[in-house]
Amino acid sequence: MQHFRDKIVVVKYGGNAMVDDDLKAAFAADMVFLRTVGAKPVVVHGGGPQISEMLNRVGLQGEFKGGFRVTTPEVMDIVRMVLFGQVGRDLVGLINSHGPYAVGTSGEDAGLFTAQKRMVNIDGVPTDIGLVGDIINVDASSLMDIIEAGRIPVVSTIAPGEDGQIYNINADTAAGALAAAIGAERLLVLTNVEGLYTDWPDKSSLVSKIKATELEAILPGLDSGMIPKMESCLNAVRGGVSAAHVIDGRIAHSVLLELLTMGGIGTMVLPDVFDRENYPEGTVFRKDDKDGEL
């Protein structure tokens, strides 16, 4: 636990953890716990289920291509409203039920993110998916002010482009870019599965640890929904983050279980070369490791 004192931990909040009331409450409590013991949590959130629900309510068709939401201007209006006005506010409220910790912000605020339009490669063909962006710059000075004030930033993933357009940023992508930019110690990505399956749906293909080069080699063949998550982990680790984790958000207190228990509960992505002395005792040794293996 002492290992994480004064270190930034970026958590991408999503999946069942953001729709089940008990899991939402447990997640908020975990963020406050991390802050109380001296870590510096930063939450980056998506809002897929809530966006889909609102699109249905207003009669707009939602579509996904290559794991990304196709974002027309009409869909973008809903995305912006739901992410910052609903999901972000709800999480800020849950965290602040424990005390005045959380501050809501977005990629639009104080130039945190700058984006450019993203094309998605589907079956080898670059495909336009609308107002979906990639982050090309992170200016975290205002975010660091929030962190250093002892607060927990809750970041909505919408961002302006240099063309003046507002883009929908995949929250997994944003979390990885932010973690690397602010020198985070760890990135954790909450999902609705136990971790990384190298050959989904074969349950025996679940791995508890993988190095960056190994992940890069299998990335194109992964299930489409996992590609943005694992790409985010890869980019974070390549950007200097000590480790990135994909964990099962359906388990209450999954963040603490992954960070603070022997062997963790999910999949840990590590740099190709690492010194286990720089990691808390036992946490690099994972569930499916052989005796003596790093």
Swiss-Prot record:
Its main location: cytoplasm. The record marks 12, 229 as: Transition state stabilizer. It comes from the Bacteria. Its EC number is 2.7.2.8. It is an enzyme of class 2 (transferase). It is found in: Cytoplasm. Belongs to the acetylglutamate kinase family. ArgB subfamily. It catalyses: N-acetyl-L-glutamate + ATP = N-acetyl-L-glutamyl 5-phosphate + ADP. One of its GO terms (molecular function) is ATP binding. GO terms for cellular component: cytoplasm. This is Acetylglutamate kinase. Pathway: Amino-acid biosynthesis; L-arginine biosynthesis; N(2)-acetyl-L-ornithine from L-glutamate: step 2/4. Keywords: Amino-acid biosynthesis, Arginine biosynthesis, ATP-binding, Cytoplasm, Kinase, Nucleotide-binding, Transferase. Substrate binds at residues 47-48, 69, 168. One of its GO terms (biological process) is arginine biosynthetic process via ornithine. Catalyzes the ATP-dependent phosphorylation of N-acetyl-L-glutamate.
